[in-house]
Amino acid sequence: LSDLDNGAFYHAERVNRAGPGLAGISEANGRIWNGNWSVDWRSGGQTLRATDERFELNFALHSEKAPIVHGENGVSQKAAGAGRASHYISLTRIATNGQIELGGKSFDVSGTAWMDHEFFTHQLEAEQVGWDWFSMQLADKTELILLRIRRKDGSVDPYSAGTFVDANGGQTHLRAGDFTLQPMDDLWKSPASNARYPIRWKISVPRFGIELEAETPLASQEITGRSKLAPIYWEGAIALAGRRGDSSIAGVGYLEMTGYDRPVELGH
């Protein structure tokens, strides 16, 4: 949860084994739960509830577009070799309203959300040290997902990829050569991990006439303090401005960066 007005960032994570009162899923009842966190889809949309000692979320969600299945033929290849891939599904534009409780106050909110679900079958290659992932909602009702995988020598991995979603929900798979993600000189140094993250980017997708700049309204959105074996993430809100063809365009999004403190060892 990013509180832009007060410059605060909140993160909560919970791991439970399956069992009564712990965690589970019931397709028959249309419900997923993890303690008192839950998603309920019996109403046709989704109802999301999550409570932490610092904040509480209660949202009603309804997807405006069909799910997107990334990759080619439903497989998002991440590296050379059998099994080095994922299945990756997104709901890229979800009408959302509800309440956020923070600091003893309740706020009514509405907006547009995004949901991702990705599961891997194997680890990355040793030469792949991290990634930069962008999810972007543009004002013309299109969405853009771009993944830049970084290699140890500083080059961009050929398995970098993306997806463009048009206003009607049609999707186009993008290969590494179809787009450019270029970090600019603005860096934020984390006091927790000492990692230096690029917090301004240039984004180019010539195939769709898209030229954007992305920057974050809140530099401190790093997720640390998990297992020592887990990657450290910078994961937070970004604002977008630029052009699509001859028209100016704006948008919002989310940026995830890993491997800036040490090489990621996902799956090893």
Predicted region positions:
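Structured soluble/peripheral alpha/beta segments that form catalytic or ligand/cofactor-binding pockets
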Residues: 1-268
